[in-house]
């Protein structure tokens, strides 16, 4: 399986300014029974999106019609906790192609890169600026250019460069699914 090449993405973003989001919050363990990558998006942030009676929690940002997009902007230390490839699958299956944060757990970062989700680590100051701008104007476009390794807030022409392993960058640019490569 391969995924779409990631070269340049311009999209609105969904802000999730919560720090220390772990993989069990991203996809609760009770939904990990499947081994195929499809269907996990329905349970992304399940316990935050729905109450115990399976009713939508209107207050959660993914349930707020003001916000949409292919970019998730998350608080510091996103993807911590147990190694759970399903968390990256859920993010991709939901429709996100990029997650922006000021820090990622290493295993989570690699799982994302392996399945076509670009984790972009930026400075805490720039992350706060993105949160502020997107909160004030949800239709703000964010541009993530992988070739240039640059994130930009399009409407105000503010940007910051980010680092990425050259091998992983090449795989994202070409749409290679690294989770299928076994040595």
Question: What spans do the regions from the language model cover?
Answer:
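A generic structural signal for well-ordered coil/turn residues at beta-strand boundaries
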Residues: 9-10, 138, 147, 158
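Short strand-coil-strand connectors
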Residues: 154-156
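Polybasic, low-complexity association/targeting segments
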Residues: 1-44
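A short acidic, often aromatic-flanked loop/helix-cap motif at beta-alpha or helix-coil junctions
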Residues: 21-22, 125-129, 148-151, 168-169
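Feature captures the catalytic cores and cofactor-binding loops of soluble hydro-lyases/lyases
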Residues: 27, 34-141, 146
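Structural signal for conserved beta-strand scaffold positions within catalytic alpha/beta enzyme cores
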Residues: 15, 119-121, 161
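Conserved small/polar residues in nucleotide/adenosyl-binding loops
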Residues: 181-183
């Amino acid at each position: 399986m391969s995924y779409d090449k990631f070269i340049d993405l311009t999209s609105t973003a969904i802000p999730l300014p919560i720090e220390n989001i772990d993989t069990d919050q991203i996809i609760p363990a009770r939904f990990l029974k499947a081994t195929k990558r499809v269907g996990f998006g329905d349970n992304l942030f399940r316990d935050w999106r729905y109450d115990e009676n399976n009713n939508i929690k209107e207050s959660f940002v993914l349930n707020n019609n003001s916000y949409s997009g292919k970019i998730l902007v998350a608080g510091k230390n996103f993807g911590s906790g147990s190694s759970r490839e399903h968390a990256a699958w859920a993010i991709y299956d939901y429709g996100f192609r990029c997650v922006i944060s000021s820090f990622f757990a290493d295993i989570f970062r690699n799982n994302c890169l392996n399945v076509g989700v670009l984790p972009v680590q930026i400075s805490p100051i720039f992350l706060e600026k993105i949160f502020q701008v997107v909160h004030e104007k949800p239709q703000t476009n964010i541009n993530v250019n992988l070739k240039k390794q640059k994130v930009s807030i399009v409407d105000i022409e503010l940007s910051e460069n980010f680092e990425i392993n050259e091998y992983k960058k090449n795989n994202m640019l070409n749409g290679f699914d690294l989770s299928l490569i076994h040595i």
